A protein has these predicted regions:
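Residues lining hydrophobic/aromatic ligand-binding pockets adjacent to catalytic sites
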Residues: 1-243
């Protein structure tokens, strides 16, 4: 069975996309519909990293999208950057029931660990054990010292994806540690969130995704180079290359 392929952007509500990707003068309240109108079937909720959204907002986004739509959700920075994975149960008890309001549209949950914080395997073990086993999870390990066989072994044990990423001229390894792959593309230049991927660069990713199709259950790719509306245009081009 071929893998389910989901390609989208990290967020949809960017005022600077109005006139660049969305129709001119698109109000923020209409941007989700404008995003959907371009044929996207997934998005990564990035604002959940900074603050917990209102339940009413999650309900509204859930109800505005089709039954086939998938929301990937970025985990709260309280868990990853403030607590640094320590004592995760109280934070998860607040976070998980809230995002579960998305129902069957809830896709992978991404936890991004901070740069300049090296491995703490005991904390990682405790955090992984605390995660409910009813969801898919991915870890974006921004500090390269986490890119080790010991960390990958732990992710593999729990069927958690090692998030492949490109940011500010740095590229993570490509490691498959779960029955799905998760990719975040923050831009091809030395400045994060800027620049547009070339067709040649996107073809490289398309070839890799095609290779994964036969061995994985799903592949999720999210573009975060929101500057000048590059992210959604790059996402649509990658979808075209995979068609």
């Amino acid at each position: 069975m071929a893998a389910e392929i989901r390609i989208g952007t990290s967020g949809w509500q960017y005022k600077h996309w109005s006139g660049r990707f969305y129709p001119e003068k698109t109000p923020t309240g209409r941007m989700l519909q404008a995003y959907l109108d371009r044929g996207f079937d997934t998005v990564e909720l990035n604002n959940t990293f900074y603050r917990l959204p209102l339940a009413t907002a999650l309900d509204r986004w859930r109800d505005a999208t089709s039954d086939q739509f998938i929301f990937a959700v970025k985990g709260s920075r309280f868990l990853t950057h403030m607590k640094k994975l320590k004592d995760p149960e109280p934070g998860l008890a607040r976070f998980m029931p809230l995002i579960e309001r998305l129902g069957p549209k809830l896709g992978p949950i991404l936890f991004q660990l901070p740069p300049r914080w090296g491995p703490d395997l005991d904390r990682l073990d405790g955090f992984l054990e605390a995660l409910p086993n009813s969801h898919r999870y991915a870890f974006e390990l921004r500090d390269a010292s986490w890119h080790t066989p010991e960390v990958c072994e732990r992710l593999r044990k729990h069927n958690i994806a090692f998030c492949a990423y490109e940011i500010a001229g740095r590229k993570s390894p490509i490691e498959i540690t779960a029955d799905f792959a998760y990719v975040r593309l923050h831009g091809p230049t030395d400045r994060a969130y800027e620049g547009s991927y070339t067709t040649a660069q996107l073809r490289q990713w398309a070839r890799r995704i095609k290779d994964w199709r036969g061995s994985l259950e799903a592949v999720y790719v999210y573009f975060d180079n929101d500057d000048s509306g590059y992210a959604p245009r790059n996402a649509l081009k990658l979808k075209e290359l995979l068609a």
